[in-house]
Amino acid sequence: MTLFPRFATRRSPLASLALAVTLAVSLTACSDDGGGSSSDGEAAENENSENENSENQNSAEGDFPVTISSDAGEFTLQEPPERIVSLSPSATEILFAIGAGEQVVAVDEQSTYPEEAPVTDLSGFEPNVEAVTGYEPDLVVISNDANDLVASLTELDIPVLVNPAPADIESGYAGMAELGIATGHVDETAEEISRIRSEVESALEEGPQEPVRVYHEIDDTFYSASSNGFIGSVYAELGATNIADEADTDGTGFPQLTEEAVIEADPELIVITDQVGYTPQDVAQRPGWDEVTAVQEDNVVTVDADLASRWGPRLPQFVSTAAEAMSQAAGVPAG
């Protein structure tokens, strides 16, 4: 399933940021629903619309206070946060890319990029409330609510922004816009989204002009990345035929296949990451896999796990890597 056709018309970067802001956040300008006569209602609607446009513009310029609505609920930031704790590697990369790095006081143990990120032993998978609050944060950014962290921090009046894994590239831009508003770096975020979008579009042109059957293996139990998730959406943008799509009946983006199903689907490209603990040679030596085209044509490749799984400033590198691998599998030069 192709989520975004390669040659679809795309919005300008600034227009996309505006759309992303609309999708990602609810600002204080949102008006309440109400009754009234037709004429009174129309007048009120016009007045509310004018107020909303004015306040949205102020928020887009980085003015505070702003009210953010995320998966953690709604909260208001009276001023730009100065002590951010990030428990999401993707959010960490984005925060530094949009100029909010100096506001970050601690990041989780998996946030290994960029080098200047203040890495700690904080866990994003099993967060400890006491450990997090020890950094006296005025904003905590997470990708999912592990250990009911949101409720625990909310009780302590610490705002939590849940910046979840996007379903595709476009919603990844929305997540970036959300962080830009929350930190007061809207202009920098617009510039970063523009850069990423431009480089992604250039990388997409490196891909083959014909479909390639792709299998992205998460681990040796045959979990894979379908087109319903962020990783798979990159292959979809490149026009791939993702062999995991049929198995993703619940739309999670990460279905589990059977070994027999993989062999029968005969992928032309198999992608594993450098964190799975085995090599392309190990994949090729699996019983029966010598029948798979990707194995026969030596198109089992390893990619950087961080690049493949993190949405943010390094997305163009993953798109370029995927495009090159797909072009090789298609037997045509990249680009």
Each PLM stretch: what is its role?
Residues 2-90, 186-215, 324-335:
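Bacterial Sec-exported substrate-binding components of ABC uptake systems
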Residues 70-72, 120-130, 248-259:
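Short helix-initiation/N-cap motifs at beta->coil->alpha
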Residues 83-135, 139-145, 243:
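A short, structured surface patch at a secondary-structure boundary
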Residues 88-89, 144-145, 165, 218-220, ...:
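Short secondary-structure boundary segments
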Residues 110-112, 228-254:
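Alpha-helical, coiled-coil/dimerization segments enriched in small aliphatic residues
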Residues 128-142, 158, 258-272:
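Proline-aspartate-enriched helix->loop->beta-strand connector
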Residues 148, 163-179, 211-234, 278-279:
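Extracytoplasmic ligand-binding site segments that recognize negatively charged/polar headgroups
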Residues 148, 171, 175-177, 190, ...:
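Structured C-terminal subdomain patch of bacterial secreted/periplasmic proteins
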